[in-house]
Amino acid sequence: MLKGAVTALITPFDDNGAIDEKAFCNFVEWQITQGINGVSPVGTTGESPTLSHEERKQVVELCVEQVAKRVPVVAGAGSNSTSEAVELAQHAEKAGADAILVVTPYYNKPNQKGLYTHFSSIAKAISIPVIIYNIPGRSVIDMAVETMRDLCQDFKNIIGVKDATSKIGRVSEQREKCGKDFIQLSGDDCIALGFNAHGGVGCISVSSNVAPKLCAELHAACFRGDYETALKLNDLLMPLNRAVFIEPSPAGIKYAAAKLGLCGSLVRSPIVPLAETTKKIIDAALHHAGLLKE
């Protein structure tokens, strides 16, 4: 079962702007040694909007090979074109991903029937599990709980949701409509603690790019009912959770990773490097979490 802290992996680039394969593989290995519960390549944090389809496939293949079945790999396979999403999903399955993460189609704004058609086409095309990624703030559409219910009832491999609505009440609604076994993962580190308390089972996390151990420990504490420890860890992480989103992501989390010597900070346009004032806030957040000692 997919559970705990799952890192929405950044994609390191070299000085020429190409994917830095060595840095990426080393980063994935570090994540595993730190105790992360799963990894999710080529999502928003992995800069999928500015990766070519071939680059997206390249990163998924690298990730699957490096992980070698030690933790689940949830490959990003979203597109606002159904046929493209099907192609990416089929590639992820062929590459050996354990599941796929599929964002609701962005920009073209389908209605609920269109959302059902999109996800059903993907589910029919593969046998591995599908996680719905519902993020109205970026896609401009919100999948209704009833549509989610219909999809998970009609397709056995649609097993859960990454919920980035920031509406904590949705957890209970989705639990009621989709069942207790429907996997609900927060898409927002800032509300992950409360999300778990309402019935969630983890988070597809941005902060865990630099704090995998702390994030995994937070969720483990939730699952054993130790909310006192979970709250202490949440307090350590909260400034970081906020700081890395002061400017458009993933510039903030890539800067934090570079500050810790994990990889370079280069982002692809139209995302741009951070202002110096933002860097100082992230530095302070890293200190607060005990991740930066200098």
UniProtKB/Swiss-Prot annotation:
Named in its record, the pathway it takes part in is:
Amino-acid biosynthesis; L-lysine biosynthesis via DAP pathway; (S)-tetrahydrodipicolinate from L-aspartate: step 3/4
SMART domains documented for this protein:
DHDPS (SM01130)
Q: Where does pyruvate bind?
A: T45, I204
Per its record, the protein catalyses: L-aspartate 4-semialdehyde + pyruvate = (2S,4S)-4-hydroxy-2,3,4,5-tetrahydrodipicolinate + H2O + H(+)
A Gene Ontology biological process noted in the UniProt record is: lysine biosynthetic process via diaminopimelate
The Swiss-Prot or TrEMBL record annotates one GO molecular function as:
4-hydroxy-tetrahydrodipicolinate synthase activity
Q: Which UniProt keywords apply?
A: Amino-acid biosynthesis, Cytoplasm, Diaminopimelate biosynthesis, Lyase, Lysine biosynthesis, Schiff base
GO cellular component, alphabetical, reads:
cytosol
Pfam families with a match to the protein in the record? DHDPS
Which family would the database say this protein is a member of? Answer: Belongs to the DapA family.
- Recorded protein name is 4-hydroxy-tetrahydrodipicolinate synthase
